Regions:
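Phosphate-end processing signature that detects enzymes handling 5′-triphosphorylated RNA
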Residues: 6, 13-224
Length: 224
């Protein structure tokens, strides 16, 4: 079947009052991920043993990728027995911050009108729910720990799994560092301390972008 006309997004704005997610993503080898999980330095700063969850996320767009061209991503995620719809914008110039809105849903079905925030609704304006199609899926096993640093609190997520289209898949092994309190510089310092334990590299490519590249049949290893 004919593939949607998706492409790498460019530009994209962040409404001035948008809720902001500040996050640093690190790409690692699966074996190195296990090494870091057991590292003494991580145990010292972890607030507890952490939690593990299975996350299944459906990503939606129109057949001509109207949302991607607007620089936004619409996702519905299953977390246990809950369903959460998220709308995210592209990252700002520093590569860390982007707008993010979330709302609970009754099922794994997109509902753009469920967002109450006017900025979120404006980003989806003119895209009726009947025009949306399920483009790709991520299936992730996530271990999350809260890390207490001298000047920040960081949520550290170890993600393994796959991003899948109907006829292709891309493996995932990455760490997401999300700032909960403090300054964004703490994320980079934490990443440098991880680098003393394992090889890693910073990535600005989101799971959504990787999914769009699969849909567009780009080689998974290009531009990561």
């Amino acid at each position: 079947p004919r593939q949607p006309a998706c492409r790498r997004p460019g530009g994209g704005g962040l409404p001035p009052e948008a809720p902001v997610e500040i996050e640093l993503k690190l790409r690692v080898a699966p074996g190195d991920l296990d090494r870091l999980r057991g590292a003494e330095m991580l145990t010292r700063i972890a607030a507890g043993p952490g939690t593990t969850r299975s996350l299944t996320s459906f990503y939606y767009d129109t057949p001509d990728c109207a949302l991607q061209r607007r620089g936004v991503t619409l996702r519905v995620r299953r977390i246990g027995q809950r369903f959460v719809q998220s709308l995210k914008t592209e990252r700002r110039g520093d590569g860390l911050a982007r707008g993010e809105w979330e709302v609970a849903l009754p099922a794994m079905v997109p509902a753009p009108d469920a967002f109450d925030d006017p900025d979120a609704r404006a980003l989806l304006d003119g895209v009726p729910v009947e025009a949306l199609t399920h483009l790709f899926t991520s299936r992730i096993q996530r271990e999350t720990r809260i890390l207490s640093l001298p000047d920040a609190v960081v949520e550290c997520a170890f993600d393994t799994g796959t991003i899948e289209t109907r006829d292709a898949s891309d493996p995932v092994a990455e760490i997401e560092l999300e700032l909960k309190e403090g300054r964004a510089a703490a994320l980079y310092r934490l990443a440098l301390s991880f680098l003393d334990e394992i090889p890693l590299r910073v990535s600005e490519v989101t799971k959504a972008e990787r999914g769009y590249r699969l849909v567009a049949r780009r080689p998974p290893g290009v531009m990561y």
